[in-house]
């Protein structure tokens, strides 16, 4: 099974793409390191104040994958202060 978490972020403090990269890159590194998920910026690469990031995991237990990605989402929501979540979605493919 493959599980994905897609998060649409609003980055109000970013006035340039360079600032945006400086904000998003540490978040992606931290999620990969702390939660052992694959991460990438998926969309809106040319927008200064928005980003869409994705996290992915594979496994054989849908409930575990759902729970693990919920943990990632909650961490971003509670601990990441550089922006806010506009929308989030978890999908599981079997």
Where are these regions (language model features)?
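Short beta-strand elements
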Residues: 35-42, 84-90
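Hydrophobic alpha-helical membrane-association signature
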Residues: 23-27, 68
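Structural beta->alpha junctions
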Residues: 11-15, 58-61
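C-terminal structural segments of small proteins and small subunits
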Residues: 57-94
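Short, charge-patterned binding micro-sites
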Residues: 2, 40-61, 93-94
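Short glycine-/aliphatic-rich beta-strand segments at the starts of folded cytosolic domains
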Residues: 3-13
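C-terminal binding/interaction regions
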Residues: 20
């Amino acid at each position: 099974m493959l599980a994905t978490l897609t998060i649409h972020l609003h980055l109000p403090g970013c006035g340039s793409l360079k600032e945006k990269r400086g904000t998003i890159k540490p978040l992606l590194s931290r999620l990969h390191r702390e939660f052992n998920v694959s991460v990438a910026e998926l969309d809106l690469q040319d927008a200064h104040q928005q980003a869409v990031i994705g996290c992915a995991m594979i496994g054989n237990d849908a409930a575990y994958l759902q729970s693990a990605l919920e943990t990632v989402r909650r961490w971003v929501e509670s601990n990441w202060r550089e922006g806010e979540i506009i929308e989030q979605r978890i999908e599981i493919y079997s």
